[in-house]
């Protein structure tokens, strides 16, 4: 009957709302997670004290951000300023009016797009709450509205919570600069106490590193029969301590169980995000202590030591001591450490990239402290473009293969890579962050690597540090006097998996950067939502998603898009 046909059409229509709601909820989960990380860093900054657990290690950056925010700095004690700035930063999470402070870093054209499309993020928590409200029963089911809020919620992460997490981590722990490290399971040491830090919050890992370097703890380790203490990292916590301290990187997300399987891990100490619940039961098969430290990530079969800024020192000391005392419980017959490891140069923050470029700038003729040398390389065609390679590795595909093969293909075509998170660790383990990897590059990029003394894949940090990439493209667009969407730059998450990756993808696209995925997002059940993400949003923000599971074709698509953008610019 006509009635039943009409109802059938209604039901078919509802699928688009269901898919759109799920996409928005996924985004909100990722945005909340990254932004809560940033909030914790702001709280830690509020506890900073010259005689306390946490100190201000980059006062110049704190002063620079304060001036950017219109805060008076003259004559202020640096710790008073830190406390004032932390309170202002925390207000960004719940302020009743206005939009995020860091949005002003974007080019004017981008800011105008955000205002016109009504996606400029307001208070961070408001965007998450609004997303959950919109997806409650009886609220939004219009795909356009749901996708628009997904972009807004993502922007509150990338230009809000993540950016604060990045900037104030630099203030507390030091702004990264190029430093040598090693990557892969071969960084574990058979004759030392091995402590693995895993998760995302540098507040924990920095303190563990402090006490692992303590002469008293090292002496105690030798007393217990070890030659010393070796700290290595997994996941984004690893990126944090690698780029500031040169701490070796044992592996990324899908390597976390393998560090326990070496039989040489005295303790795996975790904070939040991307932690396998299976680590508890697995650790019981060995002598490993599985230590959780956050009320946000409590798990079975773990030893829980509540970690906070006020008690950080005593907590970290207790954990390091526990690991040392566990060394004697190793079972030699279960110890197997693979010999594989690679050299890597990491720590290319935005500030470090500027300083690296200054080394190849003729200061007698050209202004230093800018991205002009990079723009000139791109405009001249010596470098064809850049790809931000980010995101997870994924058990649905052969882990890390897409990251590594795409990077090799891109650098061979003179495309420089900036990488973060698990993608960065994949590159490091494959030797692509070794300066000798220049030999895999096309002639133009190889020459740039030689002149600037850099690897072809630049380690820019953890997943929250994709905010550094946003600042980089914003400043490059300003230097080139073009819009971000016109730059021969694309983003790629070939093995994305987590909710955070969806939030990242949304803020990268909303910033005007075409983004390429190698794993399908959970929207294929709706032609309308799929159409919006792969095409429709381009009318809003001048960028969109491309999904291609064939990795070779994905690489070709990125190269073609870069050349298309170059042709449009006439360079």
Predicted regions and their residues:
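Acidic, Ser/Thr-rich peripheral helices and adjacent loops at domain boundaries
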Residues: 247-260, 288-292, 408, 429-464, ...
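Structured alpha-helical segments in the cores of large, soluble enzyme domains
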Residues: 171-185, 212-221, 251-258, 276, ...
């Amino acid at each position: 009957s006509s009635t039943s046909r009409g109802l059938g059409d209604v039901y078919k229509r509802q699928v688009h709302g269901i898919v759109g709601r799920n996409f928005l909820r996924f985004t909100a989960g990722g945005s909340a997670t990254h932004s809560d990380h940033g909030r914790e860093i702001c709280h830690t900054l509020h506890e900073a004290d010259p005689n306390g657990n946490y100190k201000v290690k980059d006062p110049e950056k704190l002063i620079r951000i304060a001036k950017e925010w219109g805060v008076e700095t003259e004559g202020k004690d640096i710790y008073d300023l830190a406390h004032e700035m932390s309170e202002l930063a925390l207000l960004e999470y719940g302020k009743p009016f206005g939009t995020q402070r860091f949005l002003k870093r974007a080019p004017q054209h981008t800011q105008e797009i955000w205002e016109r499309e009504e996606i400029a993020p307001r208070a961070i928590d408001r965007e998450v709450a609004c997303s959950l409200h919109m997806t409650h029963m009886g609220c939004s089911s219009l795909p356009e509205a749901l996708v628009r809020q997904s972009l807004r919620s993502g922007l509150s992460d990338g230009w809000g919570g993540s950016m604060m997490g990045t900037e104030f981590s630099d203030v507390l722990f030091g702004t990264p600069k190029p430093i040598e490290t090693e990557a892969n399971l071969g960084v574990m040491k058979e004759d030392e106490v091995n402590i693995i830090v895993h998760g995302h919050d540098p507040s924990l890992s920095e303190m563990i590193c402090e006490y692992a370097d303590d002469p008293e703890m090292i002496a105690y380790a030798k007393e217990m029969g070890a030659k010393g203490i070796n700290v290595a990292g997994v996941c984004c916590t690893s990126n944090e301590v690698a780029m500031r301290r040169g701490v070796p990187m044992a592996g990324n997300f899908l390597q976390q169980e393998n560090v326990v399987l070496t039989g040489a891990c005295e303790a795996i100490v975790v904070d939040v995000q991307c932690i396998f619940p299976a680590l508890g039961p697995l650790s019981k098969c060995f002598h490993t202590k599985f230590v959780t430290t956050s009320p946000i990530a409590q798990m079975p079969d773990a030893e829980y030591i509540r970690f906070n800024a006020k008690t950080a020192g005593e907590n970290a000391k207790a954990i390091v001591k526990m690991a040392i005392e566990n060394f004697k419980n190793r079972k030699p017959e279960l110890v197997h450490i693979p010999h594989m490891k690679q050299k890597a140069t990491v720590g290319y923050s935005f500030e470090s990239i500027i300083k690296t470029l200054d080394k190849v700038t003729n200061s007698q003729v050209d202004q230093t402290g800018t991205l002009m040398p990079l723009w000139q390389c791109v405009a001249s065609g010596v470098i064809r473009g850049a790809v931000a390679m980010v995101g997870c590795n994924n058990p649905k595909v052969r882990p890390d293969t897409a990251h590594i093969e795409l990077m090799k293909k891109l650098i061979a075509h003179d495309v420089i890579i900036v990488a973060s998170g698990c993608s960065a660790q994949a590159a490091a383990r494959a030797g692509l962050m070794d300066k000798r990897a220049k030999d895999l590059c096309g002639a133009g990029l190889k020459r740039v690597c030689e002149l600037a003394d850099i690897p072809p894949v630049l380690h820019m940090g953890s997943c929250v540090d994709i905010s550094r990439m946003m600042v980089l493209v914003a400043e490059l667009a300003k230097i080139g006097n073009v819009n971000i969407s016109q730059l021969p730059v694309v983003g790629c998450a070939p093995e994305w998996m987590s909710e955070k990756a969806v939030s990242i993808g949304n803020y990268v696209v909303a910033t005007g950067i075409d983004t390429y995925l190698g794993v399908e997002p959970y929207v294929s059940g709706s032609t309308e939502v799929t159409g919006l993400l792969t095409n429709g949003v381009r009318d809003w923000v001048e960028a969109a998603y491309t999904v291609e599971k064939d990795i070779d074709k994905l690489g070709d698509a990125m190269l073609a898009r870069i050349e298309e953008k170059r042709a449009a610019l006439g360079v």
